[in-house]
From Swiss-Prot:
It comes from the Eukaryota. It comes from Schlumbergera truncata. HAMAP family: MatK. GO terms for cellular component: chloroplast. Keywords: Chloroplast, mRNA processing, Plastid, RNA-binding, tRNA processing. GO terms for molecular function: RNA binding. InterPro entries: Domain_X, Maturase_MatK, Maturase_MatK_N. One of its GO terms (biological process) is RNA splicing. Belongs to the intron maturase 2 family. MatK subfamily. Pfam families: Intron_maturas2, MatK_N. It is found in: Plastid, Chloroplast. Usually encoded in the trnK tRNA gene intron. Probably assists in splicing its own and other chloroplast group II introns. This is Maturase K.
Length: 509
């Protein structure tokens, strides 16, 4: 970002949020490539020729000439002016990456200043950015709550909604018009945002730009909760949390009155939704709103969200996107876990003089279980097993060295163990480890044209050590396996505060 700052200071127009001139600067696209912001995207090409910065420079020059740009966008059946029809999508991707870099520039000073301010107040604030920090929050709060709203955030059916979100921050109309033109003329724009299981799925080739726009779309509606709940400490959104400061937001409060058609008194709206025990958590396209209140209050929140999305964002959301559930009777499907609050009975015997009686004390406990079926489906998609969970050999890795094969399988196994270490029941996790271990053994046996039994007999314990996590190795050296303390540590949940994101298992190669 320092290199961007040095070049941008040459042009004072950006200080007034005029980013339009930067679109025609070729060094922006060079940075997007050289700094590895999305190298896999820029190098992804169906043809034999690799990425060419010269072709991008020619494309930028053509953008000055509107007639040539329109011809290039509209005449998809003819040869483009590069003479490489099959590479058109590649250079649309490059322009998309350049746009992503440019639209992020006006927000970088705000983001940096906000993070610097937070570091002065909160020590080790990086732990709060871990997605695993959500589950200790659940353990601490959910035991005292009653109801939960499971919300699937509606995706924008029109890209214009995403562009309009930027207009409050970027005052340069020219850059927004060009961004809008680029989105509309993109040949495969219908595949950029696809409804799939009621969540926004972004194309991998254009993930940076459209994920940026979508996060702003979500962040804008989340800022309403900051005002309504008046408890910003409970709002632990893991994405763009530093951008929740909205100077322009208070000028739009009058629009909230229109959300509720049955009243014109804004104070009445706040009173209807006031809840001192309201907690909100979001990860990607799913959010959870938990409360200690009554079912009537949860229905009010549900009604508010439906009307707010429709009136303020022009988004229609079907009723099935929000579910009201009781925590004591329902499990939350969130971030790969089934989370629930269950009651454990603790029986205490009490004796008074000659009479004795038993006291049954119910104790609430937060329970997390691994969703084994989707996880096995991911392993099957990555060709580690079949759809029934039977391990198979990874044939595409048979050309690698034995050490590389074992390292890849071991890394995937350790990463899964690392992420799902917070599970209350380890049986499902042991099954996943078994699938990966046997798949690795079959891959090595296939490479050496041997049997799995003979291969395991030759390697012995050295093969199994590749699949141990660092924590398991340390515990095995300190404590014996048959001790009660060791068994408690192995079975107990662990939550790690260094997990920032989740990668696709099929692409972990």
């Amino acid at each position: 970002m320092e290199e961007f700052q040095r070049y941008i200071e040459l042009d004072r127009s950006w200080q007034h949020n005029f980013v339009y001139p930067l679109i025609f600067q070729e060094y922006i696209y060079g940075f997007a490539y050289d700094h590895g912001l999305n190298k896999y995207i820029l190098l992804e090409n169906a043809g034999d020729k690799k990425y060419s910065l010269l072709i991008v420079k020619r494309l930028i020059n053509r953008m000055y000439q509107q007639t040539h740009w329109i011809l290039f966008a509209n005449h998809s059946n003819q040869n483009d002016f590069f003479g490489h029809k099959h590479k058109k999508n590649l250079y649309y991707q490059i322009i998309s990456e350049g746009f992503a870099v440019i639209v992020e520039i006006p927000f970088s000073p705000l983001l940096i200043s906000s993070l610097e301010a937070k570091e002065k107040k909160i020590v080790k604030s990086h732990n709060l950015r871990s997605i695993h920090s959500i589950f200790p929050f659940f353990e601490d709060k959910f035991l005292h709550l009653n109801y939960v709203l499971e919300i699937l955030i509606p995706y924008p059916i029109h890209l214009e909604i995403l562009v309009q979100t930027l207009r409050y921050w970027v005052k340069d109309a020219s850059s927004l018009h060009l961004l809008r033109f680029f989105l509309y003329e993109y040949r495969n724009w219908n595949s950029l945002i696809t409804p799939q299981k009621s969540i926004s799925i972004f194309s991998k080739r254009n993930q940076r730009l459209f994920l940026f726009l979508y996060n702003f779309h979500v962040c804008e509606y989340e800022s309403i909760f900051v005002f309504l709940c008046n408890q910003s400490s409970h709002l632990r959104s893991t994405s763009f949390g530093a951008l929740l400061e909205r100077n322009y937001f208070y000028g739009k409060l009058e629009y909230l009155v229109k959300v509720f058609t049955f009243t014109k008194d804004f104070c009445v709206i706040l009173w209807l939704l006031k809840d001192p025990f309201l907690h909100y958590v979001r990860y990607r396209g799913k959010s959870i709103l938990a409360s200690k209140g009554t079912p009537l209050l949860m229905h009010k929140w549900k009604y508010f969200l439906f009307n707010f999305w429709q009136c303020h964002f022009s988004l229609w959301s079907p009723p099935r996107r929000i579910y009201i559930n009781r925590l004591s009777k329902h499990s939350l499907d969130f971030m790969g876990f089934f989370s629930s609050v269950r009651l454990n009975s603790s029986v205490v015997r009490s004796q008074m003089v000659e009479n004795s009686f038993l006291i049954d004390n119910p104790i609430k406990k937060f329970d997390t279980i691994v969703r084994i079926i989707p996880l096995v489906g991911s392993l099957a998609k990555a060709k580690f097993c079949n759809v029934l969970g039977h391990p198979i050999s990874k044939s595409v890795w048979t050309d690698l060295l034995d050490s590389d094969i074992m390292d890849r399988f071991g890394r995937i196994c350790r990463n899964l163990s690392h992420y799902y270490s917070g599970s209350s029941r380890k049986k499902s996790l042991y099954r996943i480890k078994y699938i990966l271990r046997l798949s690795c053994a079959r891959t090595l046996a296939r490479k050496h044209k041997s049997t799995v039994r003979a291969f395991l007999k030759r390697l012995g314990s050295e093969f199994l050590e590749e699949f141990f996590t660092e924590e398991e190795k340390v515990l095995s050296l300190i404590l014996p396996r048959d001790s009660s303390i060791s068994r408690g540590l192995y079975r107990g949940p662990f939550w790690y505060l260094d997990i920032i994101c989740i990668h696709d298992l099929a692409n972990d190669e």
